[in-house]
Design a protein with these regions (language model features):
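Structural detector for internal amphipathic alpha-helices that build alpha-solenoid repeat scaffolds
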Residues: 19-30, 54-71
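Short, compact, well-ordered microdomains
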Residues: 115-146
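A short, structured loop/turn motif at beta-sheet edges
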Residues: 29-32, 123-125
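Alpha-helical linker/edge segments of TPR/alpha-solenoid repeat scaffolds
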Residues: 49-51, 71-82
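Short recognition patches in nucleic-acid-associated and regulatory proteins
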Residues: 76-114, 130-133, 140
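Amphipathic alpha-helical scaffolding segments comprising HEAT/armadillo-like alpha-solenoid repeats
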Residues: 1-9, 30-49, 75
Length: 146
């Protein structure tokens, strides 16, 4: 993530650019870079309040707000894994690929159309249980402390 690019993308007021900026924050595994965006949060929130970022199954504005929470948490020294229980869009497989967590085990429950995971945060070592629910068009994830 390039903080200067993120600032430009939010300031563009283009919904797609703003969505890309939010996700570059959410996918960044460098807390020091994420922290540098803290002074821009009031401006970003004002822009997002005025722009409908769209979204098919959920508002992309919610993703932007989640990215702002990541920035605030990084600034306060709070581990990124603390956002998991506040959302239902982050896939544990992708979080593993990006280096945030390790999947300790997973189990597919075909009769429930669910996959269950136990994961460990790579930063603070907290253990979390994740339930993927795939009964609709888009899977969603329920994250809980183990």
């Amino acid at each position: 993530m390039d903080p200067e690019v993120v600032v430009k993308q939010f300031r563009s007021t283009d919904a797609h650019q703003m969505w890309m900026a939010a996700w570059s924050i959410l996918q960044c595994n460098d807390a020091d870079k994420v922290k540098t965006l803290k002074p821009y949060l009031p401006e970003f929130r004002k822009i997002c309040h005025e722009i409908n970022m769209g979204g098919a199954f959920r508002s992309n504005n919610e993703s932007a707000e989640l990215s702002f929470i990541c920035v605030e948490n990084a600034f306060r020294g709070i581990c990124r894994c603390k956002i998991y229980s506040q959302q239902n869009i982050l896939d544990p497989r992708r979080e593993t690929d990006q280096g945030f967590i390790t999947i300790l085990w997973s189990e597919l429950l075909k009769e429930k159309y669910e996959e269950h995971f136990r994961v460990q945060c790579k930063r603070c070592d907290d253990i979390l249980n994740v339930r993927e629910i795939a009964g609709g068009h888009v899977p969603w994830f329920v994250w809980r402390a183990a």
